[in-house]
UniProtKB/Swiss-Prot annotation:
Protein's recorded name: Holliday junction resolvase RecU
Organism annotation: Staphylococcus aureus
Co-factor remark: Binds 1 Mg(2+) ion per subunit.
Reaction(s) this enzyme catalyzes, per UniProt: Endonucleolytic cleavage at a junction such as a reciprocal single-stranded crossover between two homologous DNA duplexes (Holliday junction)
Keywords associated with the record: Cytoplasm, DNA damage, DNA recombination, DNA repair, Endonuclease, Hydrolase, Magnesium, Metal-binding, Nuclease
Residues that, per the record, bind Mg(2+): 87, 89, 102, 121
Residues the UniProt record annotates as site (Transition state stabilizer): 104
GO cellular component: a single term: cytoplasm
Described purpose of this protein according to its UniProt entry: Endonuclease that resolves Holliday junction intermediates in genetic recombination. Cleaves mobile four-strand junctions by introducing symmetrical nicks in paired strands. Promotes annealing of linear ssDNA with homologous dsDNA. Required for DNA repair, homologous recombination and chromosome segregation.
Subcellular location: Cytoplasm
Gene: recU
GO molecular function: endonuclease activity; magnesium ion binding; nucleic acid binding
């Protein structure tokens, strides 16, 4: 299997026993020893088992290029590419609300760069938000070991600034001011739905 640049896909045994996804091809581990993806998956599993919410990670799309059929009943994929996801990382349902969000990590101490967010992802978030979905970015600053929920309604202002070539990133202070801090705890480690509760309350007031 190959990536879009033509380079072959190789398993990384140092990450999750050799498993690796395209959406987190540059997985960064925070001071607490787990990636944002792992923490989010553990939280989602806890929510599901506790009948709190049903939220899942969307599979990374793969484009199959070459298939060999050594036998009629068996197909062997000789060449395939990971495609750029057309939407966000996670979606689901929580207390009757549609939840849709992108999860990102950065090593930067002072800002979150916007160059790894794609136009079609923002367009998807915009469409979901216009349908009254609860849409946001979950951002972890690895070095600071801090996680924030940034609502789409706030993010779109920074995105417009980025597209207008005014500023290529969102500062930590801007995220702290416009987002919701998600503290670590015991179970689940990252209870981001508490921040979602605050977002739902705030947006219900803003949209009236």
């Amino acid at each position: 299997m190959n990536y879009p640049n033509g380079k072959p896909y190789r398993k990384n045994s140092a990450i999750d026993g050799g498993k690796k996804t395209a959406a987190f091809s540059n997985i960064e581990y925070g001071g607490r020893g787990m990636s944002l993806e792992k923490d989010t998956e553990h939280s989602n599993t806890f929510y599901l088992k506790s009948d709190i919410a049903v939220i899942h990670k969307k599979p990374t799309p793969v484009q199959i290029v070459n298939v060999n059929y050594p036998k009629r009943s068996k197909a062997v994929i000789n060449e395939a590419y990971f495609r750029t996801p057309s939407t966000t990382d996670y979606n689901g349902v929580y207390q009757g609300y549609y939840i849709d969000f992108e999860a990102k990590e950065t090593k930067n101490k002072t800002s979150f760069p916007l160059n790894n967010i794609h136009d079609h992802q923002v367009e998807h978030m915009k469409n979901a938000y216009q349908q009254k979905g609860i849409v946001f970015l979950m951002i972890r600053f690895k070095t600071l070991d801090e996680v924030y929920l940034l609502p789409y309604s706030k993010f779109e202002v920074f995105w417009k600034r980025y597209k207008d070539n005014i500023k290529k990133s969102i500062t930590v202070d801007e995220i702290r001011k416009n987002g919701y801090h998600i503290p670590y705890q015991y179970q689940p480690r990252l209870d981001y739905l508490k921040a979602v509760d605050k977002l739902i309350l705030d947006e219900s007031e803003d949209r009236v």
